[in-house]
Amino acid sequence: MVREKVKVSTRTLQWKCVESKRDSKRLYYGRFILSPLMKGQADTIGIAMRRALLGEIEGTCITRAKSENIPHDYSNIAGIQESVHEILMNLNEIVLRSNLYGTRNALICVQGPGYITARDIILPPAVEIIDNTQHIATLTEPIDLCIELKIERNRGYSLKMSNNFEDRSYPIDAVFMPVENANHSIHSYGNGNEKQEILFLEIWTNGSLTPKEALHQASRNLINLFIPFLHVEEETFYLENNQHQVTLPFFPFHNRLVNLRKKKKTKELAFQYIFIDQLELPPRIYNCLKKSNIHTLLDLLNNSQEDLIKIEHFHVEDVKKILDILEKK
């Protein structure tokens, strides 16, 4: 029997930024490479890094607005060109950078006529606005407008489900994701057992972090996730067959989906920027969706139960699992 020698590169792994540009105040791009890697390692690192970039990095958002002038969130206020809903959507798009812990207060207090921009927000210390020119509202008459704001730092996304009509306070859907997109690709070189790989990683951010900062934070978060495995003691668990088996009842996808949308009053714009990577789905369900070109929450909710069941290796129980996860978010 003859064994082939497997040659492994002894070169030290190196990474570098090969492209970096700022398209606007709210769009940064960076392209990085890591090499040399053994066959299969680039995909392992690329998948883990992409999920960490999109789901593990914290961001800062405006999460609530309060004003005595606002009767309800779909009303119009005399002297203001935009509806309340449009103002809340504009506040949702304000990009902030901070090192906050917990919740902080901010304030807008202006007198018309004139334009209200992000520059008019009175911020707490350690919070800065990335683009002061972002539009909030237009006052067409000489009126006073004061809006109290809540600012939070978190990760992932938060879909607010209830309004506090008594104190004129209105929630704002928050997407705490400084990284807007991340992709990886692989270049293979060499022959046979000497085949190696180069990992290319592309990162787009909203300006609150540079791609390099995002890459550093994602790497640090992944390291922290794996550290406990270095100290774990080997344990053996014995479970009886079917000890934790659960019978899952059938639930019509359409009805629960309609109720979910009514309950959360979510907007398509928010769903469009929420990737299924952030839903913490089981790997098998996640892989089935990705193979069917379902990449965002909006893609997912645009499918009926019948559409999902037609996906190869997808089951009714998987539909219920997805709904259970969505309703807890």
From Swiss-Prot:
Residues 1-233 are annotated as: Alpha N-terminal domain (alpha-NTD). One of its GO terms (cellular component) is DNA-directed RNA polymerase complex. Belongs to the RNA polymerase alpha chain family. Its EC number is 2.7.7.6. It comes from Arabidopsis thaliana (Mouse-ear cress). This is DNA-directed RNA polymerase subunit alpha. Keywords: Chloroplast, DNA-directed RNA polymerase, Nucleotidyltransferase, Plastid, Transcription, Transferase. HAMAP family: RNApol_bact_RpoA (MF_00059). DNA-dependent RNA polymerase catalyzes the transcription of DNA into RNA using the four ribonucleoside triphosphates as substrates. It is found in: Plastid, Chloroplast. SMART domains: RPOLD (SM00662). One of its GO terms (molecular function) is protein dimerization activity.
